[in-house]
Amino acid sequence: DAGRQMDILGLSTWLRYLDQHGVSVPFPPNAYQGSYVRDMAQQMTVAHCAKYVRPAEAVLAGTPGLPEADRADDEAKQQRELHLDALIARAKELLGPDWDYVHQHALNEQLADCRDDLEQFGVHFDVWFSEKALYDTGLVARCVALLEEKGHIYLQNGAKWFRSTAFGDEKDRVVQRENGLYTYFASDIAYHLNKFERGFDKVINIWGADHHGYIPRVSGAVKALDLDAAKLQVALVQFAVLYRNGQKASMSTRSGEFVTLRELRGEVGNDACRFFYALRKSDQHLDFDL
């Protein structure tokens, strides 16, 4: 519930809300495109009418333009990301304290949907941990300060880098950017410190297999904080690929092309879903043929 992805979701919801009120702002191609974003915007309209409406010229003021839609080169991708970041900054400036409502509304709706879906699937989590809490309690800043005290941080080009190569990583990692913002890695370190400080015998991470390269840096950070790295375990989970009529179902969260667990359960039932997921070890690819 912290970081850029949540900001993008909040912005996407607000832009759809503006569109529902006749305010025409070009919707960024790299924002969240799914119909669920329109649903969240509609909920805002029902609850608050036009309270959060701002004029299009104010929203777009000072934002860099978008490249041609058919351009897929690296420069065009960077321009789209810069445009998105500028829109987020404008939203925060124009809405002021109301930005927190938009952000929280998007978070609450998606989190409630995830919780409900999992509960119906027979999966219950005792604790849901807030990433934002790591910042609100100052744990991220304390973590970076601890690493600095122990000599594991150096400054380069205005950014703070963790010497993760000293612990077997392929390169050092930024924990605080030159603009003062902390990276996702910094909050990951803080979260692991929190886990250890809660006194568990085992600290288990369940990650997607594409995060395999993340293990050395996290393990290195745990060692750098003088914590017992032997307690850290990482379980890698391969992707489940859905097939319908012999065709692979393409998925992209931002573009809105995906099949939810709820839709899958509705199509084949809870028992069949649970059976198929248990059919393979978590570190093996799963082809789920509908």
Please state what every model-predicted region is.
Residues 1-290:
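NTP-dependent nucleotidyl-transfer catalytic core
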